[in-house]
From Swiss-Prot:
NCBIfam families: ATP_synt_6_or_A, PRK13419.1. CDD domains: ATP-synt_Fo_a_6 (cd00310). Residues 1-33 form the signal peptide. This is ATP synthase subunit a 2. The lineage of its organism: Bacteria, Pseudomonadati, Chlorobiota, Chlorobiia, Chlorobiales. Keywords: ATP synthesis, Cell inner membrane, Cell membrane, CF(0), Hydrogen ion transport, Ion transport, Membrane, Signal, Transmembrane, Transmembrane helix, Transport. The chain crosses the membrane at residues 112-132, 173-193, 195-215, 242-262, 273-293, 307-327. F-type ATPases have 2 components, CF(1) - the catalytic core - and CF(0) - the membrane proton channel. CF(1) has five subunits: alpha(3), beta(3), gamma(1), delta(1), epsilon(1). CF(0) has four main subunits: a, b, b' and c. The gene is atpB2.
Length: 341
């Protein structure tokens, strides 16, 4: 590998290590939906009480669909944000609560904790790989984690950044690499038992999309200047059509981050709901046959599919971010080429 290439990649890791803490604030705290997310222990206790009480009158029996409602509460408890971590059957860790600021709950939630964990992993990973690259000479090749990260960097650099942005892609590569790794780790950690999927929180995905939006607009202003940026809003049409074109172009500016927000949030949330729903089928029907024939096999299949989706959604978000930047910075005659890639 050429020395210039080594120095360039080393620089990418150093910049990413500096940029990773910026994503610590990639959230807007949400209040826990306690009324929609009953603790698992309460559900188990309710079932136990009904089972050991032989004198339970039929008039006091639970409605037919009550068990379904309890199952739904447990599912939502695992999906929604909250101020506690449940480690059944070991107990629950309650996170610190802070007084509201201007009516906004800024208390620490489980999704905030997951964001901190992901950011810490990124800092350690990028620092480790950066240190490994500093020891590499032009006659040696990276190995282990550094080799894996080099392949990832080259993939994002060539197939995502360079192919979609073109000239000047180097300035945006650190952000694209960081956001890809950040989303990927958030998705993967959400599949681990006792973990939580921060990207299943629409506030997190919205903040990431806002980052892309402002970076895109800043890149467009830098590439075209203020006059060129405003001219782009008219789409090169006659002034008589500006009253129609300008609102359409302005709406188009905000539909892009909206699409990024909803796509990532919906895909990550839906996958977890499907997995938990399949698991609870056997409990609702109280059948080991259903569990063995349907719930377990399909849950494993969906779980493996979710691992693939975790990588896919991180790639799609990064690819679309690069595409939006490329379209915003493309000059006349280059926009079609950027769209083609």
């Amino acid at each position: 590998m050429k020395r210039v290439k080594v120095i360039q990649i080393k620089g990418f890791f150093r910049v990413m290590a500096l940029l990773a803490p910026l994503l610590l604030n990639a959230y807007l705290p949400v209040q826990a939906s306690e009324e929609h997310a009953a603790p698992v222990a309460a559900v188990v206790a309710a079932h136990a009480e009904a089972a050991v009480d032989p004198a339970l009158e039929p008039a006091h029996a639970e409605p037919a669909g009550h068990e379904d409602e309890k199952a739904g509460d447990v599912i939502m408890h695992h999906i929604l944000n909250s101020h506690s971590f449940s480690f059944e059957p070991f107990g629950t860790i309650h996170l610190p609560t802070l007084p509201p600021v201007f009516g906004i709950d800024i208390s620490i939630t489980k999704h905030v904790v997951m964001l901190w964990i992901v950011s810490a992993i990124l800092l350690v990973l990028f620092s480790f790989v950066g240190a490994a690259y500093r020891k590499i000479t032009p006659k040696t090749a990276p190995s282990g984690v550094a080799n894996t990260m080099e392949a990832l960097v080259e993939f994002i650099r060539l197939d995502v950044a360079k192919s979609n942005i073109g000239h000047g892609y180097e300035a945006h590569l650190p952000y694209l690499l960081t956001v890809f790794m950040f989303i990927l780790l958030c998705n993967i950690l959400g599949l681990i038992p006792y973990g939580a999927t921060a990207t299943g929180n629409i506030n997190v995905t919205l903040t990431l999309a806002v980052f892309t939006f402002f970076i895109t607009q800043a890149a467009s202003l830098k590439a075209h200047g203020l006059k060129g940026y405003l001219t782009h809003l008219t789409a090169g049409t006659h002034w008589s059509l500006w009253i129609i074109m300008i609102p359409i172009e302005v709406i188009g500016l905000f539909t892009k981050p909206f699409a990024l927000t909803v796509r990532l949030f919906a895909n990550m949330t839906a996958g977890h709901i499907v997995i938990l729903s399949l698991i609870f089928i056997s409990f609702i029907l109280k059948s080991y046959v259903v569990a063995a024939a349907v719930s377990v096999p399909f849950s494993i299949f969906i779980y493996l599919l979710e691992i693939f989706v975790a990588f896919l959604q991180a790639f799609i978000f990064t690819m679309l971010s690069a595409l939006f930047i490329g379209l915003a910075t493309a000059h006349e005659g280059g926009e079609a080429e950027a769209a083609h890639h």
